[in-house]
């Protein structure tokens, strides 16, 4: 029997997102958080289990695409297939049938093949206008359209003709859907905190966007999650000591807690946790050792800035005593590099930096103990 990870809790976030969906669309929502904190799991749980058939969801996941040009973006958001059997969409009437009577959740914007081929030759706004017409038809049928763009940062650097950035054009379109037409709810998900910082700081969406943090579980929720998983997977209760030990090693990251308890079916808890920490410490050690031979650089406002190993060490040393520090405490180029390397997570709305996980935090403390 394959034991799958179950969705747990998130009542606060579920209530907030459902309340948004019950209202009129007027703002773009960015859902962000550390790696593997459960952003996609949360939004999928809501659209699959909490929404009535009065909603039509278009879920586009850029995670599986390498997008470097307009063509690849169009291929990612549109589909010419009717269903899982790869039957092609022939005409507009079949599109209307799919968006008004078909499944509640579509993983692409349906388009007849002949129309799809034309999009490659036309301006990006023509693709957006087609999408707009589809959403209007959904609304006309009595359903509320919802557009979800997962891992949106994948298109950040795509440049169109005349040196226009695709992301800028997309944002203008999303503002039209929400603030101007009040046509469609829009949620953009990202695990790239530098991308969220870019969107938040750029000012293009000032007053047009809000940001929802999906963080790792707090301690109370993490311990309840352990109880839930222990009953589901191990068919037994964990001692308070075991739960404290798990939390001290991996914190509230759902995927790590699940992994630990799943492995407890056939391995000792101490062995599982020690190996996880050892692997994370080794990764960090090799990362720091590499800095003896390379000169990392980051781009900041069109300037290329070189990062020194000592600056990296000094930044990480701040976490020996604290899990969170202000982003003012670490030079911007240094934290940009550490965030890019998935060692730190930046919350730009709060101005806070912290390790991407408790595991990384423990590795930092273990490795820099003598510094």
Swiss-Prot record:
This protein's name: Uncharacterized ATP-binding protein MJ0147
Keyword check for Nucleotide-binding: yes
A Pfam family per the record: ATPase_2
Family from the record: Belongs to the archaeal ATPase family.
GO terms for MF: ATP binding
Keywords: ATP-binding, Nucleotide-binding
Annotated TM spans: none
Domain of life: Archaea
Binding positions for ATP per the UniProt entry: 33-40
């Amino acid at each position: 029997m394959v034991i799958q990870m179950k969705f747990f809790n998130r009542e606060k976030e579920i209530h907030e997102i459902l309340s948004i969906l019950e209202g009129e669309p007027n703002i773009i929502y960015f859902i962000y958080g550390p790696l593997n904190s459960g952003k996609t799991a949360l939004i999928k749980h809501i659209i699959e289990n909490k929404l009535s058939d009065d909603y039509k969801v278009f879920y586009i996941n850029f995670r599986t695409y390498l997008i470097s040009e307009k063509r690849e973006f169009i291929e990612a958001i549109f589909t010419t297939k009717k269903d899982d059997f790869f039957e092609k969409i022939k005409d507009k009437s079949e599109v209307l049938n799919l968006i008004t009577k078909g499944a509640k959740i579509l993983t692409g914007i349906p388009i007849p093949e002949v129309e799809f081929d034309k999009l490659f030759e036309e301006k990006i706004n023509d693709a957006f206008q087609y999408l707009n017409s589809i959403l209007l038809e959904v609304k006309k049928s009595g359903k509320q359209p919802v557009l979800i763009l997962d891992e949106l940062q994948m298109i950040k650097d795509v440049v169109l003709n005349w040196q226009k950035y695709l992301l800028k054009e997309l944002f203008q379109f999303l503002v039209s859907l929400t603030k101007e037409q009040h046509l469609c709810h829009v949620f953009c998900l990202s695990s790239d905190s530098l991308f969220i910082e870019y969107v938040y700081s750029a000012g293009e969406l000032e007053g047009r966007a809000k940001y929802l943090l999906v963080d790792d579980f707090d301690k109370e929720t993490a311990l309840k999650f352990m109880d839930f998983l222990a009953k589901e997977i191990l068919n037994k209760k964990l001692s308070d000591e075991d739960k404290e030990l798990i939390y001290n090693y991996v914190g509230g990251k759902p995927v790590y807690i699940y992994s630990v308890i799943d492995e407890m079916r056939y391995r000792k808890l101490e062995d599982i946790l020690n190996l996880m920490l050892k692997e994370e410490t080794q990764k960090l050690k090799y990362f720091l050792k590499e800095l003896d031979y390379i000169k990392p650089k980051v781009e900041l406002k069109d300037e290329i800035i070189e990062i020194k190993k000592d600056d990296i060490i000094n930044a990480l040393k701040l976490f020996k005593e604290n899990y969170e520090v202000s982003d003012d405490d670490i030079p911007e180029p240094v934290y940009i590099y550490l965030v890019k390397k998935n060692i730190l997570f930046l919350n730009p709305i709060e101005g806070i930096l912290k390790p991407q996980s408790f595991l990384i935090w423990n590795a930092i403390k273990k490795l820099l103990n003598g510094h």
